[in-house]
């Protein structure tokens, strides 16, 4: 089950109390104080685990507390430190206290101290003085710290697929990656984001994210709305997946409506580098003309992707991807326009190389 938002309570451990004791040995009637210090309370850490991509493990487990420190012992023995609490989260997890962002956990294997445990109390050996040889007092341990926090997950991927419901995003990600999403011929088959690793060759791979289909008004929460748009905020490149076979809504209108929703949600998201995939091209007549017209619509001075072996359909790349073009392309310009068919795997092999080249 995919979960991307939970509220939990975290607490560090209480420090252990110091010990009140006196040295007792044979022939020693009144030994001095030898009470040990209490152990410090356990700390709370967040640790980023690259092997998980959901917060589902937190469902039903609201309280996450470190252990208390052990009491001090006799003969100046210090108490054991309380066991730390390690809270494992997926990359891209943000920790909020109220509405304020507290921690942003991105790097795999990163471990961040969230709460420090309470300090252990001092034993009575610390309170011996010239005027008080037999102190009967020891400190209590300090209390730990408790916080109510909200965990929000924003998936981290290199490529983010954006499109209307039933555009073929899930079929595409299942064709070129190791992801196995549910696929069916009706809208909103995909109800949660899917992540897939795309292997290009023995040395190169990248991570692709497929989010549920966007509808008009998604930026205001319609459909699956804002709850999933946030998952493409961290992607490096967006790939608009357009259904070239739709008769009721042309590819230009699809693109314009999708971009409008992104701009309403986040201007920074709308300004990310992007490319366009014209899916279901195997059932469209004169797909080459459609692709050329769409390039003209985008003001894209493009060239055929002969280097990537695209057959039998044309593909178009921004010159930035096919040469040592030193100047970065305009952020509003498409990096590629590529007809393909996810179902029949037409041009999907070449797509891997195109996407790899598009990554900064």
Swiss-Prot record:
Its EC number is 3.6.5.-. Coiled coil: none annotated. Pfam families: GTP1_OBG (PF01018), MMR_HSR1 (PF01926). One of its GO terms (molecular function) is GTP binding. GO terms for biological process: ribosome biogenesis. CDD domains: Obg. InterPro entries: G_OBG, GTP-bd, GTP-bd_Obg/CgtA, GTP1-OBG_CS, GTP1_OBG_dom, GTP1_OBG_dom_sf, OBG_GTPase, P-loop_NTPase. Keywords: Cytoplasm, GTP-binding, Hydrolase, Magnesium, Metal-binding, Nucleotide-binding. The keyword Magnesium applies. Residues 157-360 form the OBG-type G domain. Its cofactor is Mg(2+). Residues 1-156 form the Obg domain. An essential GTPase which binds GTP, GDP and possibly (p)ppGpp with moderate affinity, with high nucleotide exchange rates and a fairly low GTP hydrolysis rate. Plays a role in control of the cell cycle, stress response, ribosome biogenesis and in those bacteria that undergo differentiation, in morphogenesis control. Monomer. This is GTPase Obg. The gene is obg.
